Amino acid sequence: MLTDGSYFHLHLVSDSTGETLITVSRAVTAQYANVTPVEHVYPLVRSQKQLDRVLQEIEEAPGIVLFTLLETELVNRLEAKCQEINSPSLSIIGPVMQLFEAYLGASTMGRVGAQHTLNAEYFQRIDALNYSMMHDDGQHVEGLEEADVVLVGVSRTSKTPTSIYLANRGIRTANVPLVAGIPIPHQLETLKKPLVVSLHASPERLIQVRQNRLLSLGAGSGNDSYIDRQAVTDEVLLARKLSAKYGWSLLDVTRRSIEETAAAIMKLLADRQRQRVPE
């Protein structure tokens, strides 16, 4: 058993980019704050010769071995070596593929790196990212009608990171700040195609986030209205009034992570699209 402050070797073996392994392993290791994984990433392992080098490194630094390999011979050799040196190993996609095969009654194509094929979905994500970056923070409002989603909200309601997250899912997302004393762009008043979502947070949460932002910028508390409780409360109320006036969807992000906010927006978008499908 590892003690606090110790480390362990984590070997990630993939016949593709290794991104899947990295994402999964880091999600798990984040739950163990007191031990440190030493990552060894081996991408594009597709031959016996390439695997030989990997096995040598695993033998020199035994630890947990996670892999995404489709070639049966490579899998068998890797698992045999791990068993020989008493290193636990696990196929990340194997159990998932078995579940799919059992349910669908069909075997896989066994295409290495198939999840990274440059298909229509990939180019859709690139297009969405380009659009979202061009339409961040109220820029190019004349193109808002081309969005799938338009996010509005007062300062520090996570509009930009949520936009980028959604864009990574292929959703064209623009965001427009709601600023006290400044009229909203008239384009927001007449949108037909996009889903407009108004992001809200409690005044307490906004003040906390804004104070941290000012400190990170070394700005101190000189901008009193930015963190003044009454001023912030007025901002929140104004945003709610605008949302009610224009029929925007309301989403409270006070206790939501970016991922949770994006998931809620994607559900709103899916529900809206279902309602528009003629029966």
Swiss-Prot record:
<comment type="similarity">
    <text>Belongs to the pyruvate, phosphate/water dikinase regulatory protein family. PDRP subfamily.</text>
</comment>
<dbReference type="InterPro" id="IPR005177">
    <property type="entry name" value="Kinase-pyrophosphorylase"/>
</dbReference>
<dbReference type="GO" id="GO:0016776">
    <property type="term" value="F:phosphotransferase activity, phosphate group as acceptor"/>
</dbReference>
<dbReference type="InterPro" id="IPR026565">
    <property type="entry name" value="PPDK_reg"/>
</dbReference>
<keyword id="KW-0418">Kinase</keyword>
<keyword id="KW-0808">Transferase</keyword>
<comment type="function">
    <text>Bifunctional serine/threonine kinase and phosphorylase involved in the regulation of the pyruvate, phosphate dikinase (PPDK) by catalyzing its phosphorylation/dephosphorylation.</text>
</comment>
<keyword id="KW-0723">Serine/threonine-protein kinase</keyword>
<dbReference type="GO" id="GO:0005524">
    <property type="term" value="F:ATP binding"/>
</dbReference>
<protein>
    <recommendedName>
        <fullName>Putative pyruvate, phosphate dikinase regulatory protein</fullName>
        <ecNumber>2.7.11.32</ecNumber>
        <ecNumber>2.7.4.27</ecNumber>
    </recommendedName>
</protein>
<dbReference type="Pfam" id="PF03618">
    <property type="entry name" value="Kinase-PPPase"/>
</dbReference>
<feature type="binding site">
    <location>
        <begin position="153"/>
        <end position="160"/>
    </location>
    <ligand>
        <name>ADP</name>
    </ligand>
</feature>
<dbReference type="GO" id="GO:0043531">
    <property type="term" value="F:ADP binding"/>
</dbReference>
<dbReference type="GO" id="GO:0004674">
    <property type="term" value="F:protein serine/threonine kinase activity"/>
</dbReference>
<keyword id="KW-0547">Nucleotide-binding</keyword>
